[in-house]
Each structure stands twice: as C-alpha cells, then as structure tokens.
Regions:
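Long, low-complexity or tandemly repetitive, helically biased scaffold regions used
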Residues: 2-131
Length: 131
C-alpha cells in the first residue's frame, strides 16, 4: 500500500497545484502555457495521460484496500463489516482484483503497473507514460 501511495504522491507533487480558491488540488494545465504553445498537441496528450494514470492509480488503490479488507475478514469475519466494500465515486463495479491477481503484492510498482494496467478489470488509460 505504501508503494502505491508513494507513486500517487510523486505524481501529485510533480503536476498538481492547489491554487484554487476552494483549496482543492488540481492538475496543472501545463499545455496552456501562454498565448501560443508550439508543443500544444504533445503537451495536451501528456496532460491527458497523467490524468488517466492518476485515475487508474486510484482504482488500483481501491482494489488493494478491498483486498486488505478481504484478507483481514478471513481472520476476523466482522472486521469493518459495516464499511462493506470500498468504491470510487465514478466506478461502482470493478473495485476488486480478479482471483489470479490476488498475489502477496498485486501492485507491482509504477513502471510495471503502466504495462499491466490495461489487463485490470477497469482502467481508463494504457501504456507507458513519461512522469
């Protein structure tokens, strides 16, 4: 769990800004760097890739936390039973690993995750991106 949290924080610290008046953190729209950006198309693609990667990492965190709850409940059946299963706001289904993914360490780290995320039961991005 610490590894995935560290990877999310790395991306957030690299690309996010909290300049909003409501205190929310947003991804900096670096493709809008002034009046004219000769790299606009490439920068926009990179921005979208980062947004999709962060979203996929949130889905992965949800799967991992549900796996932890499942394993805890195998020893203590009533553990956090009132919490049920964890979900993200945008995806109600597909918030668990498939049986073949339930290894001792299902999150393989950021670089490897970029390769395997398209095999997960739900993802919005795929492939390697530059972080």
């Amino acid at each position: 769990l610490a590894m995935i949290v560290d990877d999310v924080l790395h991306i957030v610290n690299s690309y996010c800004s909290n300049r909003r008046s409501d205190g929310m953190v947003t991804i900096e729209k670096f493709y809008k760097n002034g009046l004219y950006n000769p790299n606009y198309d490439d920068d926009l693609k990179r921005y979208k890739d980062i947004v999709m990667m962060l979203s996929d990492l949130v889905f992965e965190q949800t799967r991992l936390l549900n796996l932890i709850l499942k394993r805890m409940r195998s020893y203590m059946p009533d553990y956090q039973i009132e919490a049920g299963k964890l979900m993200t706001d945008s995806v109600v289904e597909h918030n668990e690993y498939r049986e073949d993914e339930e290894t001792s360490s299902p999150y393989p780290g950021l670089k490897e995750y970029m390769i395997v995320r398209s095999t997960r039961n739900y993802h919005i991005g795929s492939g390697m991106i530059e972080i």
